[in-house]
Amino acid sequence: MSPPYDAIVVGAGAGGGLASYALTRAGLRVLLIERGPAYDPARDYPIGRPDWDLGDTFARSTPDTYVVEPQPLAADGAHLRTTLYRHQTTQREYSYQRACGVGGSTLHFLGEAHRFPPHAFRMRRLYGVGRDWPLTYEELAPYYGRVERLLGVAGQAHPLFPRTEPFPNPPHPLSPVSQRFAAGARRLGRTLVPNSLAILSRPYAGRPPCVYCKACYHGCVVGDKSSVDVAVLPEAQRTGRLTVATGSVVTHVLLDRRGEAEGIRVLEGADKVERIHRARLLFLAAGAIETPRLLLNSRSPRFPHGLLNDHGLVGTHLMENVYIARLYYFPERLASHRGVPIDAHLLDFVTPSPAGGCPQGFSLSSYGAPDGLKTPASFALSVPRGHGRLHRERVARHFGAHAMILGLAEQLPRQENRLHLLDDQPDAHGVPRVAIEVRFTADDRRMLERMVPLCDELATASGVAATAGQVSSYDLPNNTHPCGTVAMGVGPEDSVVNGFCQSHAVRNLYVTDASVLPTQGCGMAPSLTVEALALRAAEHAVSASKGG
């Protein structure tokens, strides 16, 4: 008896959603497994409550899932430490709590929809750092375009990212804050350009445009943000070939006698009922921490050290962003709490400059009022000092006048930055906890030292009145874009999957999340690249399964 599904997809985020979309539209019956719930924006998102900016909307992987060894900080790095949110520490501390739910990280992402520039695919060849990809920008460009059309991306063409067609929607108008930063950039001989965003700037595909409430991180109640649950999975569900199973934790990948993937073992619901699901194709898209965790836990006589781990590469080369976010006060209130979160960015430094001490590319972005500082309540709790009348006066004076510049650089891949299982420390589902080892290096510090004065230079040229503080990956990594732990490459000696996200060792197993990225894209957000890769991988799997 044949299984009821042709393909199983684990993880309903960016990569899993696009894989499910492509597979169902190709005629395959797909089971999409998600450990979190399906959210109802009207019921579950907090934007209608007065305290909406003070809490967290989405379920998270529990803190006891991961163990991270802190890293002592250098005594001479005080100027790089976090000063906002009253965070003071003598060591680097991590919190790898990922959002769980249908939509994955796109539930709370800020909508950035970036292509990686062509040079990001050839970092080793061009600049002698990082790794080269097993595919080129030109090969991925058609898939970028298709995903942009599906999501209704709003943007403006830029020479760094060659394209053969315009964006589906025009860019969002610059906020008053970004207009000030754009004027400052012009004074410096630089250009602040509109950000490309998976947030609708006009009605598109039956969905309304953005209302500029700036609540993207807490879930979009309007439906203009193109999260996977809103813009992608409904298209797959219309085929009648998609089954979504929520509240399901995958514990093992199962192999048949030939060494091919035949299914998964799952614990379903609060009662943790064990079930086995089978299919002829398997896509893992649980993220750069959970996907290698699942692979390492799926030991067998063929793979005694973990599935696909013949060469000890699963879980290695973990990358996180190197970032500095500087908060400033303008002399007047500019409604910085309104608009899309990051509506403009400076791309002058996306091309690396090894001779100038910057082997990684980076971007500077106009953030306005960042998450956690977007309402009077959250702002009052975090930034202005003082008590009583003085505190109230400072909140009244500075709220809406505060704006952030974000410097975002990629971290170079290093094999020693890795994760491994703690077999003697199971979590609530019996899956071993994960130990994460990531070191902040001299290269990372050089990038911070480079970005801080550039942020201040732009702020000064734009007329800011004062600096309010900063948040920094020097001591407070936010782990927004972890990637690289199941990296793609040419062969099994130095990679786990090929350029189609197909595993070298198990040919009917694909990985379609950020874990496959060999590098981070020189300061660009990864979700659009993950989605383009997933679309390409799914079409390859369909063709390969038909003998094409």
Model-derived segments and their meaning:
Residues R25, R29, G36-D51, T239, ...:
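Glycine-rich loop(s) and the adjacent beta-strand/alpha-helix scaffold that form part
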Residues P37-P63, A99-H108:
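Conserved N-terminal glycine-rich FAD pyrophosphate-binding loop of Rossmann-like flavoproteins
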